């Protein structure tokens, strides 16, 4: 449910020399393997205490390696589809939008937009890295000289303009957009970079790049939908695995560390977040996992996710620590489950984003818990954990094939407990909605 934002790949038969301009047509692109990736370490908590034998995590993917804790060590990332041809097609579409809207250039800094258009992932730093795209789909990556080898591997079909430590990268960018009167800039580009670009390009107008990239990224292509399916299946397996772990007597942080370990063992190359909210902590949707010890009788909200080759997972289930749940806990869980089902029933091609929120909210309102549903029903997901479309009142955007989003109603009773259920879903080509998460929605009991 909550996110910080990867994959990296490129296309080409040879490495492009620094400064060489390449006009890579879509027809010339060939499939190729290999991706440049970045990953962050999972949250580090206290190591879990010695535990009983842990069943092997279930999987449909063969594995040759098993960890000392009995978990399969494999990666669905090994069978993720190639992104290389897709990035060139996306640049062509972005260039068409530049022409339609009268922009002379698109400047994209490190982040999801850079990966989406170039297949290159690098973390933002004080050294400027910038993709420059013109209305004819001519692309150049301006990058520090020391990063040029990485760019060559990740995006060999894109020209490079490198700069040394004593050179001014803003002059290099300016030289590529001399004729551009209006420039679209990446939404998340650092303000310090934007100000220096404005100084290097006086008398130009600047606008945010979401006018170009938002519409493209909302509608996932087949490669992206498959990536989201695989990463969601990986998260499902992690959930099934955590149900076999002990809860009572252990801290939220220890259980969160288990979730991170399971996500990696089941194929994730990045752990984004592991919310473990037990007892009264469950009434805070974005609870910071703590050292509170889980007790018998607690209801526990588990909201976790990460990335596999850049594409994000996000799943929430609520469990109960005892053989049987209390009457109200079970009642609230049933209401939330019915609310999610109503959201699914409303989701289809042509439906407005707010109509899914209204459908889920109506169930909770009618059950008498309306004031305790305190957030929107869902958010888009892809290369970012939260992106358009947002399923919230007032958003009249219509759902279209390729749009992927969460459906995650919740009820939060202050000082007592909370319940949330979340899946990722996608609108298919035939206009129907398809869940990408398949893990059981039952109010599971754990030891």
Q: PLM ranges: what are they?
A:
Residues 1-48, 69:
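Low-complexity, Ser/Pro/Gly/Ala/Val-rich intrinsically disordered tracts
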Residues 3, 37-39, 53, 73, ...:
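N-terminal leader/targeting segments
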Residues 10, 14-17, 24, 28, ...:
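Exposed, low-complexity/repetitive linear segments and helix-based recognition motifs
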Residues 47-66:
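Short alpha-helix boundary/capping segments
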Residues 69-447:
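Active-site neighborhoods and metal-handling regions in enzymes and metal-associated proteins
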């Amino acid at each position: 449910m909550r996110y910080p934002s990867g994959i990296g790949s490129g296309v080409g038969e040879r490495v492009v020399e620094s400064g060489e301009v390449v006009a890579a047509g879509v027809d010339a692109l060939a499939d190729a393997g290999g991706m440049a990736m970045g990953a962050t370490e999972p949250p580090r908590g206290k190591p879990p205490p010695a535990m009983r034998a842990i069943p092997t995590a279930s999987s449909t993917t063969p594995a040759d390696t098993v960890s000392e804790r009995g978990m399969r060590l494999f990666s669905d990332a090994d069978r993720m589809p190639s992104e290389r041809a897709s990035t060139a097609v996306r640049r062509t579409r972005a260039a068409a939008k530049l022409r339609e809207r009268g922009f002379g250039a698109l400047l994209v800094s490190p982040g999801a937009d850079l990966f989406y258009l170039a297949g290159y992932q690098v973390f933002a730093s004080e050294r400027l890295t910038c993709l420059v795209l013109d209305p004819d789909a001519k692309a150049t990556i301006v990058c520090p000289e020391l990063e040029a080898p990485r760019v060559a591997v990740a995006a060999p079909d894109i020209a490079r303009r490198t700069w040394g430590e004593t050179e001014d990268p803003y002059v290099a960018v300016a030289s590529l957009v001399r004729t551009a009167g209006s420039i679209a800039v990446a939404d998340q580009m650092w303000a310090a970079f934007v100000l220096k670009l404005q100084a290097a390009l006086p008398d130009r107008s600047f606008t945010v790049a979401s006018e170009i990239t938002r519409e493209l990224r909302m509608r996932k292509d087949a490669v992206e939908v498959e990536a989201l399916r695989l990463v969601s299946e990986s998260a499902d397996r992690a959930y099934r695995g955590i149900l076999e772990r002990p809860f009572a007597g252990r801290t939220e942080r220890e259980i969160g560390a288990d979730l991170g370990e399971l996500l990696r063992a089941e194929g994730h190359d990045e752990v984004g977040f592991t919310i473990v909210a037990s007892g009264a902590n469950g009434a805070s949707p974005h609870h910071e996992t703590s050292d509170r010890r889980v007790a018998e009788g607690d209801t526990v909200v588990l909201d976790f996710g990460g990335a596999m080759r850049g594409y994000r997972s996000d799943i929430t289930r609520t469990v109960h620590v005892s053989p049987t749940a209390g009457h109200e806990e079970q009642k609230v869980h049933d209401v939330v489950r019915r609310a999610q089902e109503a959201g699914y029933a409303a989701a289809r091609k042509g439906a407005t984003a707010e109509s899914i929120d209204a459908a889920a909210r109506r169930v909770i309102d009618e059950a008498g818990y309306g004031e305790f549903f305190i957030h929107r029903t869902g958010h888009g997901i892809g290369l970012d954990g939260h992106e358009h479309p947002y399923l919230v009142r007032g958003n009249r955007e219509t759902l279209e094939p390729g749009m992927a989003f969460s459906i995650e109603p919740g009820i939060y009773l202050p000082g007592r407990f909370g319940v949330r259920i979340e899946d990722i879903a996608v609108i298919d080509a035939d206009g129907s909605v398809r869940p990408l998460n398949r893990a059981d929605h039952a109010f599971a009991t754990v030891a």
